[in-house]
Amino acid sequence: MIIITGSKGFIGQNFLKYLLEHSKEEIITVHEKDAWDWIAFFNDWDKVSLILHQGAISDTTETNIDKLHAMNVWYSIELFEKAIQYQIPVKFASSASVYGNQQGIVNPLNYYAITKLQMDYYIQDHMTEFSSIQS
């Protein structure tokens, strides 16, 4: 079983299309509006072989930092903790809005980029626990 968060986004759509054409595994897609309910009630973690975590509120004009932080940071942490508990590999994507084409000091362009950078730092800080997570 493969879980894809953010399957309506560009990268998620392409992952989904590829997997539908090339994989025989069951695919579960998770969307923003039901993400918290899904993670709370999903009980088949032991059957999951891979999590493709592309889901985030990616609206670069969103100014509600609490909303962004809840979905882009806290939800991601919950998902990663499930991955650790069940030893599920995770593929996670950062964002060009965090790094752009710059060298040196990171200067996120918007609140969305700030939350993505927070997750990048979180993963770096917990790499020994998150040995199955690749960004």
What are these regions (language model features)?
Residues 26-43:
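Adenosine-cofactor binding site in Rossmann-like domains, unifying the SAM/SAH pocket
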Residues 1, 49-50, 89:
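Structural motif
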Residues 38-71, 82, 98-102:
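NAD(P)H-binding glycine-rich loop region in Rossmannoid oxidoreductase-like domains
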Residues 69-76, 80-83, 115-116:
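Short alpha-helix in the Rossmann-fold core of NAD(P)-dependent oxidoreductases
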